[in-house]
Amino acid sequence: MYKRQQQNRILAGQTFPKDKLVNAKGKKVLVIGGGDTGSDCIGTSVRQGAVSVTQIEIMPKPPVGYNPATPWPQWPAVFKTTSSHEEGCTRRWCLASNQFLGQNGKVTGVEVEEVEWIPAADGGRPTMKPTGKKEVIEADMVLLAMGFLKPEQPKFAKNVFLAGDAETGASLVVRAMAGGRKAAAEIDAY
């Protein structure tokens, strides 16, 4: 978040002292998260002159091409290589980050552990199982680009109604529309 806010201010014309800039030049960068944000972090780090860039993802490597496990209208879970990936990085899957390591207030690496995904007998969401195989990935810059499963639902007053991404997390616009209709019916009943 801090890096993005700083970059937005720079693009708007604000200047920062060199020692205050968040910059990947000369750094070993670890990107935690495999989505679009992670891809953006990779490209920016490479362009800024990172010594190395590694991207880790807790999920398994998705299949190339059509994935029968995610038919339309679900978001297709397929292997993607973006232009940022092509700029250069190491990509690894089925790794959970256990702890950040550091010295003198600066990160030096992240302890990661391989995980297995056990399919659910009922076809539902698989269960993650740590394998005990741990290693340390050296890094002096770690960028968090992780997604989320669903939004946390805080307790709202009875007269507050949610719809769309605020209720379900990022999803299809048709689901947001259905949520809007449901919220309207609840408001009407209230």
Which ranges hold each PLM region?
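Residues forming the flavin
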Residues: 3-190
